[in-house]
Curated annotation (Swiss-Prot):
Belongs to the radical SAM superfamily. Lipoyl synthase family. It is found in: Cytoplasm. Its EC number is 2.8.1.8. [4Fe-4S] cluster 1 binds at residues 37, 42, 48, 275. Keywords: 4Fe-4S, Cytoplasm, Iron, Iron-sulfur, Metal-binding, S-adenosyl-L-methionine, Transferase. Residues 49-264 form the Radical SAM core domain. This is Lipoyl synthase. InterPro entries: Aldolase_TIM, Elp3/MiaA/NifB-like_rSAM, Lipoyl_synth, rSAM.
Length: 282
């Protein structure tokens, strides 16, 4: 049985509750939308929703994969909601966002793994929200670069795809996805030259600093210019336990190392998540 590791003081989370938080919650629920904020039990939901920002999750709320770090429901998804792209775009307008972030569940049940739905969502956001910048956090599309090209051609401002963890731990942490497939997706995005390629990773799953630095080097070699590094927090008892809580000082050390290695932007702190302060990553 895994030993329980006590959560340290620096991981105390600010709860939401101001007027903007309530307004954001109302808009999301009123359009029957899903957010990774709620499905992933994100520790920054209170802060972000209180600032009027949210990360929209398209493709429904049931994922075809079962990554052991993730709290999103797993199973057989419902058919795509054809109105979802418009609802997301309208919610962005109602929130008055200048920058929006969209992610999705994996839809391995669909012939195109949800790529066309992604494109429609990006197009609707552009149509309804002139001037809004957009980051998309995409799945690996099982390494189908023709599908990745569909996302690139839709012209979001940033395309993100998370490596999530170091090479050694990938088979036990992620489902279906492989480290090399994710690197290939990131390389393909970067080689397009049309937008920044961004990735993210979690710490506290048993990785070593040497392995973290290897991931940084691999990401840089693939052309990644933006990276986020945060503490893994076990969202439920069915998920992987936390092996170690990394100190804020260790995160700052990694941030400085990442800058020295050549990342244009690096966010590294215990509560950093892939879309946290995403407007800074353009």
């Amino acid at each position: 049985m895994a030993q329980h590791v006590k959560k340290p003081e620096w991981l105390k989370i600010r709860l939401g509750g101001n007027e903007k938080f309530t307004e954001t919650k109302s808009i999301v629920e009123g359009h029957c939308l899903h957010t990774i904020c709620t499905s992933g039990k994100c520790p920054n939901m209170g802060e972000c929703w209180s600032r009027g920002t949210a990360t929209f999750m398209i493709g429904g709320d049931i994922c075809t994969r079962a990554c052991r770090f993730c709290n999103t429901l797993t199973g057989r998804p419902k058919p795509l909601n054809e109105a979802e792209p418009t609802h997301v775009a309208l919610s962005i307008k109602l929130m008055g966002l200048n920058h929006a972030v969209v992610t999705s569940v994996d839809r391995d049940d669909l012939p195109d793994y949800g790529a066309a739905h992604w494109v429609k969502t990006i197009q609707e956001i552009r149509r309804i929200n002139s001037g809004v910048t957009l980051e998309v956090l995409i799945p690996d599309f099982k390494g189908r670069m023709d599908l990745v090209d569909m996302i690139i051609e839709a012209s979001p401002d940033v395309i993100s795809h998370n490596l999530e963890t170091v090479r050694r731990l990938t088979p036990s942490v992620r489902s279906v996805a492989t480290y090399d497939t994710s690197l290939a997706v990131l390389r393909h995005i970067a080689q397009s030259g049309k937008m920044p390629a961004k990735t993210g990773m979690m710490l506290g799953l048993g990785e070593t600093e040497e392995e973290i630095l290897e991931l940084m080097d691999d990401a840089l070699a693939a052309g990644v210019s933006v990276i986020t590094i945060g503490q893994y927090l076990q969202p439920s008892r069915k998920n992987l336990p936390v092996v170690e809580y990394i100190t804020p000082e260790q995160f700052e050390h990694l941030r400085l190392v990442g800058i020295e290695k050549g990342f244009r932007t690096i966010e590294s702190a215990p509560l950093v998540r892939s879309s946290y302060h995403a407007e800074r990553h353009l």
